[in-house]
A protein has these predicted regions:
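Ligand-binding pockets and gating/stacking loops
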Residues: 2-437
């Protein structure tokens, strides 16, 4: 297990009581109803999206770009680790990531990501929900995962599953930045914290599956009568949908059981919880679940930054390379987009506690697989990593790139509950076309 190392963040959230992240069950997909795609452009677009999936590797707390994708060896900001040559000529990565360095020619790295918000909760909301929009109490946008789950949904499967291997250390938990909002509760994630599977998805020994299905059939009969004169009631529909979601997750309970995988596959991912959750993610993606988020925490290295990254980055390197290799070998990577992202990067300056603080001016993200041009190293920072040197990328542009990569029009417009138009990305946003295939 990774050694627990100190973090002395001065962010306002750190003054709140620390609580364990609470996992909940919610959000299953409906299917595309029998439609004839012949000659229909709208349906052709739906078919293009139908088998697309996204895995988000979320580095909670803020992975340091200096100790991963954008090292600055020999500079006062660089730290003690070497930079090593990668499989992309001229591009060097931290020595802590040798596995990814050997296969980064199959990924796209953006080294010029920039965000104005550097508080954990605010930055997470900014990154995961609003793109470059500042959400307010009257205008809020669904999270990236909820939007992708809605757009890529598959019949009988969860729209999104969200794993955590560490507690969100601020009041309110992850719920602060993973809302479906006007999309409806069915698109909210199944949240699984500190384990590999949701609780309570196995039938008790005293109840057979046939008995359970008979009870469900009776419940549906009674519910149909109740809904006869309430067909437009969203609350009633959501209540009925919750039963279907529970039944659906019970039907796929075996996907959460990694013991069904060959030992060599389990060993490839490693014994960390993050690694085993990544293996479950691959199983879910292979079955058609459209969006899985894997949250690895806690990267908030205000103290002992180099010790924390020396401990955690090799695990990320192993898990990420194993996941990408596994997806590729199974023929899944061409239809699966794998994203590494966080709420922020780390400061160039090294503080008195040998840590790096919050930093949004310039840091790194990656994209691999579906719709992405491999081997692209996009953007750059200056010699000390204190500013973007070329090709600044905003959160809105990054969102647009993700949507376009999986066949979703990033200019698509939804209507909120109060009738206001809300686009997937802000007006006048363009994707980063240099990384799109």
């Amino acid at each position: 297990m990774n050694k627990q190392l100190p973090s002395t963040c001065g962010a306002p959230e750190h003054s709140l009581n620390r609580r364990a992240f609470l996992g909940g069950v919610g959000g299953f997909a409906g299917g595309l109803a029998g439609l004839d795609a012949l000659g229909n452009p709208l349906l052709a677009n739906q078919l293009e999206k139908r088998h697309k999936r996204v895995i988000l590797l979320w580095m909670a707390g803020g992975l340091s770009q200096f100790e991963s994708w954008d090292p600055k060896p020999g500079r006062k900001t660089g730290g003690p680790f070497r930079a090593i040559q990668t499989s992309v000529p001229g591009y060097r990565m931290s020595e802590l990531m040798p596995m990814m360095a050997s296969r980064v020619h199959k990924s796209a790295v953006i080294r010029s990501f920039s965000s104005p918000n550097t508080g954990h909760t605010g930055a997470s909301v900014f990154a995961l929900m609003s793109g470059d929009r500042q959400d307010t109490g009257t205008l809020r946008t669904p999270s990236l995962g909820c939007l992708l789950g809605r757009e890529l949904s598959q019949p009988g499967l969860p729209d999104q599953v969200s794993f955590w291997n560490a507690a969100w250390p601020f009041s309110g938990g992850d719920k602060q930045h993973d809302f479906a909002l006007f999309l409806g509760a069915r698109y909210e994630p199944i949240n699984i914290a500190h384990k590999l599977a949701p609780d309570g998805i196995q039938l008790p020994a005293s109840l057979t599956d046939d008995d359970h299905r008979a009870r469900e059939a009776l419940r549906e009969q009674l519910a149909a009568r109740f809904q006869e004169n309430r067909s437009g009631n969203a609350t009633v529909a959501s209540h009925g949908g919750s039963y279907q979601r529970v039944r659906g997750i019970m039907d796929i309970a075996g996907l959460f059981d990694v013991s069904r995988e060959p030992l060599r596959i389990r060993e490839r991912y490693g014994h960390s919880l993050f690694g085993q959750q990544a293996l479950v993610a691959r199983r879910l993606i292979e079955a058609g679940v459209p969006f899985v988020r894997l949250t690895d925490g806690w990267w908030d290295s205000h103290g002992e930054n180099f010790e924390i990254h020396a401990s955690k980055v090799p695990t990320l390197d192993r898990v990420m390379s194993a996941l990408l290799e596994d997806l590729e070998q199974r023929g899944l990577l061409q239809d699966t987009l794998v994203v590494t992202f966080a709420e922020m990067g780390r400061t160039p300056q090294i503080n008195a506690q040998r840590g790096r603080d919050h930093w949004g001016a310039c840091w790194s993200v990656t994209l691999t697989g579906c719709g992405i041009k491999p081997g692209v190293i996009h953007g750059s920072t200056n010699a000390d990593g204190t500013a973007v040197a070329t090709d600044r990328v905003t959160a809105a542009q990054f969102f647009a790139t993700i949507f376009q990569a999986v066949g979703i029009d990033h200019q698509k417009e939804y209507t909120s509950a109060d009738g206001r138009p809300i686009r997937l990305t802000p007006y006048n946003t363009e994707p980063v076309r240099a990384v799109l295939a």
